[in-house]
């Protein structure tokens, strides 16, 4: 993949996301990426519906999206940045660290979550990101995460 291709992608639909990430239903937490700024930042979208399997047990009478899945959506959006930048088939992005995680407000079916992810630093194959999950412009969760790019044959 050329350097130009890695910096000119401004959005990604589900087909492009599935080329970048190995996740599939029911664990693909990003439906669309509406903005990608090179390897600096991205905004991923998750449309939350009551039909998702985790709502059968979390909680049937008052469904709330598990916080860990918000973190996963942040990590997958960050992973798409890494995968797009590296542009090498056969690479995997591993979620390594989570720091400063805060959950501010419940996310419920019908919400549209935006995962705002910004690269904080990169050294070699290690990437650090600050992430905010927002619903209707309000921060519902935030975290600092770390990721590592690994060749599939080394995994």
Curated annotation (Swiss-Prot):
Q: Where's the active site on this chain? A: 58
- Does this UniProt record's set of keywords contain Lipid metabolism? yes
Q: Which pairs of Cys residues are joined through disulfide bonds in the record?
A: none
Q: Which UniProt keywords apply?
A: Cytoplasm, Lipid A biosynthesis, Lipid biosynthesis, Lipid metabolism, Lyase
Provide the catalytic activity annotation.
a (3R)-hydroxyacyl-[ACP] = a (2E)-enoyl-[ACP] + H2O
A GO biological-process term: fatty acid biosynthetic process
Q: What is its EC number?
A: 4.2.1.59
Top-rank taxon: Bacteria
Q: Kindly indicate where the leader peptide sits in this chain.
A: none
Pfam families in UniProt: FabA (PF07977)
Per the record, what is one GO cellular component? cytoplasm
**Location of this chain's protein in the cell:** Cytoplasm
NAD keyword on record: no
Q: What is its main location?
A: cytoplasm
A GO MF term:
(3R)-hydroxyacyl-[acyl-carrier-protein] dehydratase activity
InterPro entries this protein is in?
A: FabA_FabZ, FabZ, HotDog_dom_sf
What this chain does, per the entry, is described as: Involved in unsaturated fatty acids biosynthesis. Catalyzes the dehydration of short chain beta-hydroxyacyl-ACPs and long chain saturated and unsaturated beta-hydroxyacyl-ACPs.
PANTHER family documented for this protein: 3-HYDROXYACYL-[ACYL-CARRIER-PROTEIN] DEHYDRATASE
Q: What family name appears in the similarity comment?
A: Belongs to the thioester dehydratase family. FabZ subfamily.
Protein name (database record): 3-hydroxyacyl-[acyl-carrier-protein] dehydratase FabZ
Gene coding for it: fabZ
């Amino acid at each position: 993949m050329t350097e130009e291709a890695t910096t000119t992608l401004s959005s990604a639909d589900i087909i492009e996301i599935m080329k970048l990430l190995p996740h599939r239903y029911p664990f693909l937490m990003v439906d669309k990426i509406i903005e990608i700024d090179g390897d600096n930042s991205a905004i991923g979208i998750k449309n939350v519906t009551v039909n998702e399997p985790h709502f059968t047990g979390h909680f049937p009478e008052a469904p709330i999206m598990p916080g860990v899945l918000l973190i996963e959506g942040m990590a997958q959006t960050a992973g798409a940045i890494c995968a797009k930048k590296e542009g090498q088939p056969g690479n995997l992005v591993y979620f390594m660290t989570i720091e400063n995680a805060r959950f501010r407000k419940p996310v419920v079916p019908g919400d549209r979550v935006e995962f705002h992810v910004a690269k904080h630093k990169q050294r070699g194959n290690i990437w650090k990101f600050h992430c905010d999950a927002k619903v209707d412009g309000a921060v519902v969760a935030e975290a600092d995460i770390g990721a590592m790019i690994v060749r599939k044959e080394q995994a």
